Amino acid sequence: VTSGAADVLRLLTVRGETLAVAESLTGGLVAAEIASVPGASKAFRGSVTAYATDVKRDVLGVEGTLLAERGAVDPQVAAQMAAGVRRLLRADWGIATTGVAGPEPQDGQPVGTVFVAVDGPFETVFGEPGGEKVTSLRLNGDRTEIRMESVRSVLALLLEELAGEQTGNERAQDTERNGGT
């Protein structure tokens, strides 16, 4: 898994940007993975393990009505966790994990239902702030496998956003440079 964390940190460091992590089902595994990379302190601000529902609400600012209506395993909850930890720890990027590692279903969701989210300085095509990205996963395996795959998935989602933004910028520069000749 560490290569994903190393790639994320390399891109963040190059960009001079920072990361905060909010975790539920992964219980600190994402933060541990990031912190295991030498030089992580250049970009990693910290994390909140919001395992209990009231911590998601009271610390990360997830809407109480959303939690009451949908439960903690929900794409909007993941999005609000990522936005909340980003705001709380004053980071450029926030990532979050919430889901059901098992062995029992939770909030009406089957084991292996996981939502990972990224919140960051996105821009839409019109240059407006673009909010957050959430990925819905249906994972197989035991509790440990589901948690480890959730770590890989949230880091991959962030890496995709970081690399995508960089690629987009490079393409735009190429187009300008070669435009009209």
Stretches with model-predicted labels:
Residues 1-181:
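Short alpha-helical segments enriched in small residues
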